[in-house]
Regions:
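Conserved catalytic or regulatory cores that recognize and/or transform ribose-phosphate-containing ligands
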Residues: 1-59, 64-310
Length: 310
């Protein structure tokens, strides 16, 4: 596999303030659960190395999310070598029934004893020589291949109030004068990148503003284009739009903000701070990335922009 951008959240983002880091506080993300769920929502696949109580909690949190569990893979150490089953009977019963779509890969780690106290010794694991063996590597690569998908983005009117949980489907319904829309995190990230291809939006982002003003601007543009696109399909006017994220109950602006953070950490855009003001610029990598994608937003010479179906 060719080398890709690797993003370690702790190397880019922090709670509170620290020089050289973007702060979660500035985009109103206050807890680690929301951050991890949003990161998982943006991802094609999720791999959890399950060897402790904390990873068990993470496994349960993701596996109980209908939108996330279908793209999960759990790496579990061989129970014989560590003399215990890391996936408990409760987790097994709750999430690993015969029709479960969660993939499991057993690996054979190096095991050592860690003395917590005189009477309590715990078995802990390492990858042998801190490397992934060819056999395990092939299994992981097979899962990655499975997760590669072309986002088939399409708009679908809800029937009987039921949301379509397919990643690429944007579900919508009209409730009085309000348009209610449900979008996956992956589609939002993809469409935000599309917005950054629009000259007028890029010009506004290059101006020095407070960070929340940039976020509100991108969020407003996103909602306006989405609103117009669906109104054209409904052939009906609605006054307001409410956009919800399928995977997690957070505000749309929080998702837009975190998508900008992720693009910055992946070196696709720059978020530059000068005193208390910020300006956002595009990097060459984003232009190259967008050139390899199908059109996301209608041409700029159209009077009103629309999001396009794939």
């Amino acid at each position: 596999y060719p080398k890709k951008n690797v993003l370690i959240l702790e190397e880019h983002f922090v709670f509170g303030k620290r020089e050289g880091y973007l702060s979660y506080d500035d985009i109103f993300l206050k807890n680690l659960n929301d951050i991890e769920t949003l990161s998982a929502a943006f991802a094609n696949g999720i791999i959890i190395i399950h060897d402790s109580i904390s990873t068990g909690a993470e496994l349960a949190a993701f596996a109980s999310n209908e939108m996330l569990k279908d793209k999960m893979c759990v790496l579990e150490p061989d129970s014989t070598g560590i003399e215990e089953r890391k996936i408990s009977a409760f987790l097994e019963l709750a999430f690993f029934s015969t029709d479960s779509k969660i993939r499991r890969i057993v690996y054979y780690p190096e095991v050592y004893s860690f003395e917590i106290s005189e009477k309590h010794v715990e078995k802990r694991t390492n990858f042998v020589n801190n490397t992934i063996t060819p056999i395990l590597g092939d299994k992981i690569c097979s899962f990655i291949d499975y997760c590669k998908l072309e986002l088939d983005i399409r708009f679908e009117k809800m029937k009987f109030g039921k949301i379509n949980n397919s990643v690429g489907v944007i579900s919508y319904s009209k409730n009085g004068n309000e348009l209610q829309v449900y979008v996956s995190g992956q589609v939002i990230l993809y469409q935000v990148m599309g917005l950054l291809s629009i000259n007028d939006i890029r010009k506004q982002l290059r101006k020095k503003k407070r960070l929340y003003e940039h976020i509100d601007f991108v969020c407003g543009q996103y909602k306006n284009i989405l609103h117009h696109t669906i109104q054209e399909k409904l052939k009906s006017e609605t006054n307001t739009i409410l956009v919800s994220v399928k995977e997690i109950n957070v505000e749309l602006r929080d998702v837009i903000a975190y998508s900008l953070y992720m693009l910055q950490a992946l070196e696709l855009i720059s978020i530059l701070k000068e005193k208390e003001l910020y300006k956002i610029g595009l990097k060459n990598n984003l232009g190259i990335f967008l050139s390899e994608l199908d059109d996301i937003v209608s041409e700029e010479d159209n009077e009103i922009l629309e999001f396009l179906n794939e």
